[in-house]
UniProtKB/Swiss-Prot annotation:
Protein name, per record: Outer-membrane lipoprotein LolB
Database matches in PROSITE patterns: PROKAR_LIPOPROTEIN (PS51257)
Lipid modification (N-palmitoyl cysteine), residues: C22
NCBIfam families: lolB
Length: 207
């Protein structure tokens, strides 16, 4: 069944956006080598996280669309996760469940759609181009498929560049949660052309 584009995401109005108004603390200090043993140890510790959840603020900004929401991400296993977007009243606007090659999305009217490609489904139904396959890694502070990346002075990801076909994505890490072991990002921004995706993670739960 072809996926028809629907009017999803009547989400948070501009006045309620907290992301733009918040100051950020970008990791600073001299760049460190991606081949350093400290980075390898941190990378391996993060890669061992197979079950976790995080929640916070989400913004998608482009010339054609602006979406603001609260998000909840739960990773059940390496190939199974859930992404939930809600409005200020707590009502579900988008509920995405992915397990291996089966993708199910429920919209704000309770309609369900099934596909085998999460990125394509999100793009067709919402108009948002979100690199979900790599975002799962980037949220954790891992480079994913990107080979061009830089570290900060604490051997964490500071920025990366990823070429996806004709598109070039850049990711800037603006803050980390230093209370976690291993330390995980608390604020990052993705850019591609006129598109920007901002994520602010309020908390992490690791299992």
């Amino acid at each position: 069944m072809p996926i028809r584009k629907v009017s999803l995401l009547r989400l948070i109005p501009l006045a309620s956006l907290v992301l733009a108004a918040c100051t950020t603390t970008k990791p600073t200090g001299p760049a460190t080598s991606p081949t350093s043993p400290q980075w390898r140890a941190h990378e391996q510790a993060v890669q061992q996280l197979s079950q976790y959840q995080t929640r916070g603020s989400f913004a998608y900004l482009s010339d054609q669309k602006k979406v603001y929401a609260r998000f909840f991400w739960q990773q059940y296993s390496p190939d199974r996760y859930r992404l939930l977007l809600t409005n200020p009243l707590g009502s579900t606007e988008l509920d995405l469940n992915v397990q291996k090659n089966v993708v199910q999305l429920t919209d704000n009217q309770g309609k369900r759609y099934v596909s085998d490609n999460a990125e394509e489904m999100i793009r067709k139904l919402t108009g948002m181009a979100i690199p979900l396959d790599n975002l799962r890694q980037w949220m954790l502070g891992l480079p994913g498929e990107a080979s061009d990346f830089k570290l900060d002075d604490q051997y964490r990801l500071n920025s990366l560049t990823y070429q996806q076909g004709s598109q070039t994505w850049t990711v800037d890490y603006q803050d980390y949660n230093n209370s976690l072991k291993p330390q995980l990002p608390s604020r990052l921004e993705l850019k591609q052309g006129d598109q920007r995706i901002k994520l602010k993670m309020d908390d992490w739960t690791l299992k």
